[in-house]
């Protein structure tokens, strides 16, 4: 992939929660947005108050939980991703 998130942004591959709801088929428009994902790429960091670059705490491969309305959904090379700010990440799973 030839893309790179900028600053404090993180490229995330959402983890779809495809739990069965009995025999009811739920259309895509009614499904909950995923709030878990795998970090694919991270930006270079953000500038702190002193002007220094502060690297991000998350890294490629981390499984994260992020806020429901975080980021921008994009499609790259036929795959769905979300670009979010590190501040929208609530948890890193270990």
UniProtKB/Swiss-Prot annotation:
GO terms (BP aspect): chaperone cofactor-dependent protein refolding
Quaternary state and interactors: Heptamer of 7 subunits arranged in a ring. Interacts with the chaperonin GroEL.
Alphabetical list of Gene3D superfamilies matching this protein: GroES chaperonin (2.30.33.40)
Keywords: Chaperone, Cytoplasm
GO cellular component, one term: cytoplasm
Superkingdom of origin organism: Bacteria
Protein family (similarity comment): Belongs to the GroES chaperonin family.
Gene that this sequence comes from: groES
Organism from which the protein derives: Orientia tsutsugamushi
Keyword Cytoplasm: yes
InterPro entries: Chaperonin_GroES, Chaperonin_GroES_sf, Chaprnonin_Cpn10_CS, GroES-like_sf
This protein's name: Co-chaperonin GroES
Primary role: Together with the chaperonin GroEL, plays an essential role in assisting protein folding. The GroEL-GroES system forms a nano-cage that allows encapsulation of the non-native substrate proteins and provides a physical environment optimized to promote and accelerate protein folding. GroES binds to the apical surface of the GroEL ring, thereby capping the opening of the GroEL channel.
Lineage: Bacteria, Pseudomonadati, Pseudomonadota, Alphaproteobacteria, Rickettsiales
Coiled coil: none
A Pfam match: Cpn10
Localization annotation: Cytoplasm
NCBIfam families, alphabetized: PRK00364.2-2, PRK00364.2-4
GO MF, one annotated term: protein-folding chaperone binding
Transmembrane segments: none
